Amino acid sequence: DDNWMNNSFASRERVKMDLFRRFGAIAAAGDRHLAEFCPGGWYLKDPETVKSWCFGLTTVAWRKEDLKKRLARSERLYTGEEAPVINQTGEEGVQQMRAILGLRDLVTNVNVPNLGQIPNLPLGAVVETNAHFSADSVRPVFAGPLPDSIYPLISRVSGIQELIVQAALDRDLEQAFRAFQMDPNMNLSMPDARKLFDEMIENTKKYLGMYFN
C-alpha cells in the first residue's frame, strides 16, 4: 500500500487543507513543500507533529541508499549490462521542451521572474506561477496580487531569498548568515544559530573556495 505511512513522498493533503481553511487560498504544492515553507512550529515542530499531519520526511539513510542505487544503475547502463528502456515517464519537462520547439502549446506552473504577474511582490523576484509555453517563448500568466491574508508569509520568504541571492553574488557569508537566521524554520538562539551556520560552512568549505579567496 503506497500511502504516507510507508512512502516519504506521499501525504493525506492535510496541510494543504489546513492552509486553505486558515487563509482562504488553495496551495498548488504538496504537503511536504508547504510545511517547509511555513514557520517551523506549525507542521515541523517534531516527529510527532509531522506524523499528526499525515506526511512523511525523507531520511538521510533513504537519500544515501537511493543515490547508491542510481549510481549502480548508471554504471550498468554505461557498461551495457542493462539496456535503456525508452518510454514516457510523465516528466513535464519534456512537454515544456516540445512547446518551446513549437510542437504544441502548454500552460503550466514554473519558476520564472516576476514580470508583474504578482503585482505586490518585487519585480524580478523568482515566483512560481502559470506560464504559457509556445515556439521560442515562455510568457508568465497574470496571477493577480497575493491576498492580504497570506502576503506577510510569502513576502517574508521572498525577501529572505533576495537576501541570500545577493549574499551569493557578493560572496558575503555575513549576509548569508543574516538570511539564515531569519528563515521561518530557524528557531535557535542567536549563538546557537551562529554555531550551526559556522559548522555548515566548515563542513562544506571545499565547495566554497570562492568565499575565502
Show the residue positions of the predicted features.
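Long, compositionally biased stretches enriched for glycine and/or charged residues
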Residues: D1-N213
